[in-house]
Amino acid sequence: MDNSRKPGVIAFVCAMPMELRPLVRKLSLHKSQIGDLRVRAGTLGGHQLVAIVTGMGTRLAKTETGRLLDAVGVQRVVVVGITGAVDNTTPIGTLVLPEVVVDSVSGVEYRPAPFGGGSPHGKMWTTDLLLTDTDEVAGLRARGVVSLDMETAAVAEVCEGRGIPWSVFRAISDRATDGSIDEEIFHLSHRDGTPNGPAVARYLLRHPALIPRMVRLGRGVTRAAETAAAAAVRACSQP
């Protein structure tokens, strides 16, 4: 990618490869490299596009977003991916456009820049912890939290520190308190978001009755990733 310092670049930031995959397909992004940074790149409506996978959690999100912004002259950062619901009624695949993203550790609130229309509402809660306790999640819901994620506030912190507008498109892939995800399932992925194949195989051998649940979870994740990517592409396509 030989024009990484030109203005007008839109950067997509995903935590996991499965969140990036729909963007690659919808935007025909190709593999590229900027220095030692591996990216996907393309164009849309006169904009240069670049996309990265950071890995899961706030530390990796902050580090990799910083590396991207060091390497590329970015006009806007767009976070794209999945998020967990804090109730048991929100349909899987529902698009979440938060008014505010909260860092669960510092309490700092970040406001996404408007991008592509939509009606933002509620708070997204960024935490490195897997939250499944019913009372804890109910407390967050009472404070206006509508979904949980593990990276967005960290990306926002880096962007705002550099004066770069950022937006977020996430969609519901699971529900925090319905039993679909627990610590064991959570750790079936590496921190870079790729599946831990041996761990998955061992889990399914120990719990064959849970295979249908895992299939449903996988379908929900795929649906959410597709929804979030489609919304991000629509926003980028608008004049």
Locate predicted features:
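Short, conserved "active-site rim" segments that organize catalytic pockets and cofactor/ligand binding
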Residues: 7-27, 95
